[in-house]
């Protein structure tokens, strides 16, 4: 029967994140710090806009690239927030989540055998999407003492004549690291020197806590070689709506649109109307959620260090990535035993690549009370196992 399956699909492993999430779902009393999803409900005015669109009969296809009014609003949003200039006519595309935007971006540019350089630890989908396109993921190892960030020198060491693109996630999933403008400037010079495309996963851009977020596409000479990937799931608490977008020069955007129109036709209309309302009237809610995440981060990361799990300071997203190297066990074993003994679900760092071994990913996108109870259980687990 395996002869029926694509070689590309057979070489891909199931998501390690879902494995622990699914296991936790079978147990009672579990505090999940596993899946990266806001604990907030989508703002009422955003939900109401979607309901109103249905009541008014907007149930048909939209343009392949998305509602023009939404693309106009995305264009204004990118300009006002991140100093990015993209035309709603031919440089923006609304997608079914940021993951689909990344998928079609990779498929639009990567030929079989071409390489995409990816700093790790990295989000589990990156390798799979590159491999499904026939490409080869090439990893750059990063470490906690350097903030889990790759440098231009790291990319120089990994580049070959087959390199087509580099993929940067800032703020990072799973580490929460944020690239500074100075660091991005150096990486931009590398990209221009070697004429490679930059895939910029900026889904967590709004959730940057300590410094102003910089998009690499805003740097001189970078818009024409960058695809910005973003969406509404994280900052707007709209994970279930599955709505994202990509911003790219028209040549790349049009190539992505070819794939999108055959695979998806368009993103769901009711979700697009919801996102439109979010951009127009939902930024105060985004800011409130951001402030809450910042408070949780400060509490959680400080407490992790106090109980003996060394954790670098994450500048964005809603993840902590503490070291468990002192425990004398693998990250997968640690996660399994913490779940079975104390009913706290975390994700082993190893699922994010070899650089993640010896760490665990903890999402602090849950209530302060849940975080405090999780810390009590984790501290008890550490005392029992050391």
UniProtKB/Swiss-Prot annotation:
EC number(s) stated in the UniProt entry for this protein: 2.6.1.-
Residues bearing the modification N6-(pyridoxal phosphate)lysine: 234
Enzymatic class: transferase
Record GO biological process: amino acid biosynthetic process; amino acid metabolic process
Chief subcellular location: cytoplasm
Keywords: Amino-acid biosynthesis, Aminotransferase, Cytoplasm, Pyridoxal phosphate, Transferase
GO molecular-function term, one example from the UniProt record: pyridoxal phosphate binding
PANTHER family, per the entry: ASPARTATE AMINOTRANSFERASE, ASPARTATE AMINOTRANSFERASE-RELATED
Family to which the UniProt record says this protein belongs: Belongs to the class-I pyridoxal-phosphate-dependent aminotransferase family.
Name of the protein: Putative aminotransferase YugH
Organism whose genome encodes this protein: Bacillus subtilis (strain 168)
